[in-house]
């Protein structure tokens, strides 16, 4: 994010190289994600902003249920260390409707969610399709596959990544975050029909 705009990672490389390097460092052990193609026309995974059709409190609660002690939301943590803040933007669908949007089912394990494991280096292209707003429904909870992933991470003593096996809406371009509501993942869900995107300070 630069100013009030959330940029795809690949655009950050030109716009804000220091922030790009900080975000890129989060791909340690899964660097192949940086070159992962998600469409026949060559669109890359990180040519998009990754949004989730799930209230972030569901992610927090799933971790709490398993005793993973997720951190409380804290804006200063991201500002001072670049680490996860627990804060998300609430993004109404009509706010991004003029952009190219893809629906990503996130079913098949690949290096993005399983760093340093023997899994494919790119996701199957058939898990991506043009986004259809008329079919969109917010997920009521994390997927069964995500819950199983969290259990596996706990059993192996590893820190879980945030959105493994959670479907995504991928936005192929920047998102103006001015006037978007910021929500904390440790606050309970309200009834809304929007997407969430991680706040990057």
Residue spans for each PLM region:
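Active-site-proximal loop/hinge segments that shape catalytic or ion-binding/gating pockets
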Residues: 1-49, 56-201
């Amino acid at each position: 994010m630069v100013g009030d705009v959330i940029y795809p990672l690949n655009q950050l490389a030109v716009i804000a190289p220091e922030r790009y390097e900080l975000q890129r460092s989060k791909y340690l052990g899964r660097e192949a994600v940086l070159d992962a193609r998600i469409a026949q026309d060559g669109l890359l995974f990180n040519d998009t902003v990754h949004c989730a059709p799930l209230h972030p409190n569901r992610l927090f609660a799933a971790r709490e249920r398993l005793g993973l002690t997720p951190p409380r939301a804290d804006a200063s943590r991201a500002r001072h260390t670049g680490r996860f803040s627990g804060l998300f933007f609430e993004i109404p669908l009509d706010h991004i409707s003029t952009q190219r949007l893809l629906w990503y089912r996130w079913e098949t394990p690949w290096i993005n969610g399983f760093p340093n494991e023997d899994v494919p280096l790119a996701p199957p292209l058939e898990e991506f399709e043009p986004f259809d707003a008329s079919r969109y429904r917010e997920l009521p909870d994390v997927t069964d596959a995500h819950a199983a992933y969290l259990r596996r991470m706990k059993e192996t003593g590893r820190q879980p990544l945030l959105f493994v096996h959670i479907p995504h809406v991928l936005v192929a371009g920047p998102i103006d975050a001015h006037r978007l509501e910021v929500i904390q993942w440790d606050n309970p869900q309200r009834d809304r029909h929007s997407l969430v995107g991680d706040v990057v300070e």
